[in-house]
Amino acid sequence: MRVFKFGGASVKDAEGIKNVHHVLKTVGYEDVILVVSAMGKTTNALEEVIKNYFDKSPELNSSVQEVKKYHNQIVLDLFEDESHPVFEAVNAQFSDLEYFLAHNKSPNYNFVYDQIVSFGELISTTILSHFMSFMGIETQWVDVRNLVKTNSNYRDAEVDWDQTKKNITKTIKSKSLNITQGFLGSDENNFTT
């Protein structure tokens, strides 16, 4: 099994996504775990969402819409057919983000940070997974939060390596391209860490 990691700058736009496809076609994609960061400066943009959330700023909605617009443009650049399932999948991710912002009761900054910033990686891997499938590569999108188990020390969680190894062994498919997120895990209550 090979592991490739693509950082945010390498997947900041449609051309970057196409380049990842080109790299995988060149080096092979069977028995691969592809770990992908949030696209471009998405983490910074989501940190602005967090700031607006805690400040109860009227700019909260527009800061979310900026992140959404950025990702929707990449999706439009990759997929001309707006009926492609990727549009629904990305919109579902943003619906989850908006639901969290509307219903969260926790005042814990670190908890909120982990829940919100994680959407960058979740959305980027969703887009990349759909594009690889669209290009004919058998792909398994893996929510790394189901694999990497941690304690509840938000923003500085410690990994339960024994449980994590078991989860990876059980979930990762050989002979296919497994696309997942970096920097994420989840605690015993399945909250993102």
What are the functions of these language-model segments?
Residues 1-193:
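Nucleotide/pyrophosphate-binding catalytic subdomain
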